[in-house]
Design a protein with these regions (language model features):
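A charged, well-structured terminal subsegment
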Residues: 151-163
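Acidic, proline/glycine-rich short linear motifs
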Residues: 21-64, 166-168
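Structural beta-alpha unit
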Residues: 1, 15, 41-42, 51, ...
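Intrinsically disordered or low-complexity boundary/linker segments at protein termini
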Residues: 1-14, 95, 114-154
Length: 168
């Protein structure tokens, strides 16, 4: 069976750590590895970001394979591009970060989501628990790409015995 691949964009905030914990909890169930991605702005030194990301990964107690990745670019393009390159099934992203992404709310979060054909699980400041997700909300239109994402939602809902709410 092919190992699934998840992406967790990480800005070194506490909510990014929570997104990582959600990804780990789900990855254990579906046999996935996790690429943890930090995007550094153009002209910035990546060595400190690499060190911070490696420190986070080494301090995370996980049975799941965590792979550090640092890219130079911007979050609006690079998260989606990276997910496509890695053939990711899901992106787990925290919102309301306090450092690099302090403005990832509202339309900025939507820009990141819209830049990718890979489905997102958006988390806030609630940690993952063993029960998974009681409710999953799926915004749905009738284009082909959106319909394809329903298979991933169905898998997650089956694993966690979640109730799915479709919004059109």
């Amino acid at each position: 069976m092919k190992t699934k691949n998840f992406i967790v964009p990480h800005d070194f905030s506490s909510v990014a750590n929570i997104a990582l914990q959600h990804a780990i909890a789900t990855a254990k169930i579906v046999n996935a590895e996790i690429n943890v991605l930090h995007v550094v702005g153009k002209g910035k030194d990546i060595s400190e970001a690499e060190k911070q990301l490696n420190d986070i990964i080494s301090s995370t107690n996980s049975e799941v394979k965590l792979i550090p990745n640092v890219r130079i670019g911007n979050i609006f393009e690079d998260i989606g591009d990276f997910a496509a390159e890695k053939h990711a099934e899901l992106i787990f992203m925290g919102t309301h970060g306090i450092q690099g992404w302090q403005h990832i709310t509202g339309s900025n979060a939507l820009k990141v989501i819209n830049s990718s054909k890979v489905p997102f699980i958006i988390v806030q400041e609630k940690t993952a628990d063993d029960d998974g997700y009681q409710n999953i909300i799926v915004p749905l239109d009738l284009n082909k790409e959106t319909k394809q994402k329903l298979a991933v939602v169905a898998d997650i809902a089956t694993y966690f015995k979640s109730k799915v709410h479709v919004i059109t």
